[in-house]
A protein has these predicted regions:
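Short, glycine/charge-rich flexible loops or terminal/linker lids adjacent to PRPP-binding catalytic cores
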Residues: 120-163
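Short glycine-rich phosphate-binding loop at a beta-alpha junction
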Residues: 96-104
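Short Gly/Thr/Asp-enriched flexible loops that form oxyanion-binding sites at enzyme active sites
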Residues: 109-118
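Conserved G/P- and acidic residue-centered "switch" motifs that form tight phosphate/ATP-binding loops
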Residues: 167, 172
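Active-site-facing substrate-recognition patch
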Residues: 27-96, 147
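PRPP-dependent phosphoribosyltransferase catalytic core
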Residues: 27-39, 45, 51, 176-220
Length: 220
């Protein structure tokens, strides 16, 4: 199954913040970031949303460029734009989704909001050790070791169609593990919805069996 088609428009953000630059934090430039063209979200709103995403080099270790999207939730306008955009960009029709599953931790910030707007339930995919038994556990490899995620063993009903959401896709390892755990719980993976897609990495290709969408693309 192929990805949902994605068209993007490059934009210039409102302004750079000198105080942020002095702290080794910068707001995106036009060569860094593109935003998906949407029918119901204006280019101005899309540009405003993306301008709130920060880049923090060297965090949490020197080899990482951290993409911080938490400022999007700092006001009602940007939160509304985010949910409107995610709904507009859904990779599958809303009526083909039964549950929204969010990955810990940042998928918990907007996953329930999206689920509420769509009239769906929410499934929390948690880091290992956070849920009482019985649970289903799925382990996967990271660049620096192994990690595990868990869901409650009765979190889905057989045949329920689950849209998995997260703030960012990089290598795709966590997302693929999320798909595996949903299937092990007898759910059906309806697709994936991401806020940010890092380019230059094979993340989306790891999910080529599922419809996928992302709102913002930027280099890894």
């Amino acid at each position: 199954m192929s990805h949902a088609s994605r068209e993007y428009v490059t934009f210039f953000p409102y302004s750079n913040n000198k105080s942020c630059e002095e702290k080794n934090v910068r707001i995106m430039t036009a060569t860094d970031i593109t935003v998906k063209t949407l029918k119901t979200v204006s280019n101005d709103d899309a540009a405003y949303l993306a301008s709130l995403v920060r880049t923090v080099p060297g965090f949490p270790n020197p080899s990482i460029i951290f993409r911080d999207f938490l400022p999007i939730f700092s006001n009602a306008r940007s939160s509304r734009i985010l949910i409107d955009s995610l709904i507009d960009a859904l990779p599958v029709p809303a009526d083909s989704i039964d549950l929204i599953a969010g990955l810990e931790a940042r998928g918990f910030l907007f996953g329930p909001l999206l689920a509420s707007r769509l009239g769906k339930g929410f499934l929390a995919i948690r880091k290992a050790g956070k849920l009482p038994p019985p649970v289903i556990t799925e382990s996967y490899m990271l660049e620096y070791g192994q990690a595990s995620i868990e869901i409650e063993s009765d979190a889905t009903k057989p045949g329920q169609r689950v849209l998995i959401v997260d703030d960012l896709i990089a290598t795709g390892g966590t997302a693929k593990a999320a798909a595996n755990i949903v299937k092990r719980a007898q759910g059906i993976v309806a697709g994936f919805s991401f806020v940010i897609e890092l380019t230059g990495i094979s993340g989306m290709s790891e999910l080529c069996d599922y419809p996928c969408s992302s709102l913002i693309t930027m280099p890894a």
